[in-house]
């Protein structure tokens, strides 16, 4: 049985605090291994990529054709999809693109009361690297969620790296790459791929920003290379918090909880409800549904290790504070009127409003990005957006009159800070 925490019990605060503080990131000590891989790629370039790709993926980068997946191959993968699946990917891409186009910031250019011209210009980075995992996490939706905002932002060069164990590439991922319009796809994965994107090699030219999910080695590589390049975030295991009253169908809520549990054994699913009987019904339905899932083994491991049910007396009064402390990646508000909860909860990666808005629809076709902060990082960070592929340059301009209005204050502050050259730069113009 998974833990059930009752908010009215004396030991609730201690138990909830342990839940908040628990870490689910992989405990493997990968830091040293990743440091070694990064150094090897930085110093040995393509030769290191050949070695690591053979060792980890069982794939030889022997000839030029072995290194890249052609854009023609991506186009063929798209054309060969079943029509209904092709239409679903197209719909997802259209909605993702429309949502992110609405995020584009506006440049500013104005003259203030002192006559100083001020403003800012937004520009896209030149090149972005998109990491696409192989194996269990080879999701075409993730490629769309990373590549489309970059293209909307105006990035000119989109580079995908993806491991292809034994040379096999996921055709759905290739089809998504065709839809998103990526420019290059390299058959390289792991920390070594992140290093290649950051440092560049003879074959793979460096990029400015790296985004995309990956395993512990990929996440650690991004962490270590932040500053050499920009990154989206250091992501951990997926998580969902469902706030639900007893008016819900317990089957629906059970399925929503399992939508994250099936991702990985370290994923976490939490239910907050104000009805203990409903909580028991949901638990029963979780057990039934796990037995029906092809991903049941993973979901069972996740639910048994990290699933939690919290029973409160008043959802409106108690759930927001608990949700803020959890700062979950996904928060579902399965109640009649989710608006008060939406505005009361300050820390969440993405919020899903009402009984007809399961998290799964946001993963694919709603439009908002599904690359979201995990591990309580929603307290200080946001989901992926066009801004992750852009930077802002401020500008200012003064004439003689406006310089006379504000220059003396600048000189006084420079003297106060003990920087006479700064002061002289201003004072010479004031004479």
Q: What do these predicted ranges mean?
A:
Residues 141, 152-168, 244-252, 256-294:
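Glycine-rich phosphate/diphosphate-binding loop of Rossmann-like nucleotide-binding domains
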Residues 3-8, 184-189, 308-315:
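Short acidic-hydrophobic, aromatic-tinged amphipathic segments that line or gate anion-handling sites
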Residues 259, 263, 271-348:
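A glycine- and small/hydrophobic-rich beta-loop-beta segment
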Residues 324-431:
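C-terminal core of ALDH-fold dehydrogenases
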Residues 1-125:
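N-terminal Rossmann-like NAD(P)+-binding subdomain of aldehyde/semialdehyde dehydrogenases
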Residues 110-175:
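Conserved small-residue-rich beta-alpha loop and adjacent elements
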Residues 181-268:
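Conserved NAD(P)+-binding/catalytic subdomain of aldehyde/semialdehyde dehydrogenases
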Residues 45, 128, 150, 214, ...:
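Buried hydrophobic positions in well-ordered alpha/beta secondary-structure cores of metabolic enzymes
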